[in-house]
Amino acid sequence: GYTSRTVAQNPPYNFNTEHTWPQSNFGEAEPMKSDLYHLFPTDITANSMRANYPFGKAISNVTWQVGGSKLGNNSSGQLIFEPRDVHKGDVSRSMFYFITRYPVNYGGFFTQTQESVFREWNKFDTVGVVESNRNNAIALLQLKRNPYIDHPEFVDRIYSFATSNTRPTFAELNVLPIKVEFDSTNISEFTTQQIFFANSGT
């Protein structure tokens, strides 16, 4: 979750479930609402602070922070929620899963701005044992896996999650050898030249 706190208390426990993709964006409809891959246990206050704000890096006007998670403004002045460091990768991979599993992009919530941050977090907070075990446990129930937990590198092979844009192509042609020299050849003899073309573009 967002705060990683241990609190001994009597009921009510101030504990609930966070929908990483805000359920208000898809009208609390199933199967999105109960898809465990984007559900995480959380402190009620932290869940309330997150509300349905997008994710990002809080760099100014931080009005709430506990356990490393923050509510504040990003570099564009947008109010966002930043999860603690050890949960950043979990958030990113659950969001990549959700937009892949449910490509409608409910509420237009998955933006290019968030995607850039998620790509960074996917590499910053790599898959650990707990996240991997969680993936295995959920797969037993839902009969499907989060591929971005099994293969985080898949993220780099997808050009855009937020749009339907395709990767632009750039030719980067290399020819070897750079120079070919032709010399004299006797009658009834022949000379062979090899020229290699390699396109290392995209």
Which residue stretches match the model-derived regions?
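Short, solvent-exposed loop/turn segments enriched in Ser/Thr/Gly
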Residues: 186-195
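Domain-level detector of nuclease and nuclease-like folds
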Residues: 3-167
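Compositionally biased, intrinsically disordered low-complexity segments enriched
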Residues: 21, 195-196
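Hydrophobic beta-strand positions in extracellular immunoglobulin-like domains
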Residues: 45, 196-197
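Aromatic-residue hotspot detector
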Residues: 55, 148, 177-178, 182-187
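Hydrophobic residues on conserved beta-strands that form the core of alpha/beta folds
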Residues: 17, 175-177, 192
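Surface-exposed binding patches on compact interaction domains or structured appendages
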Residues: 170-181, 201-202
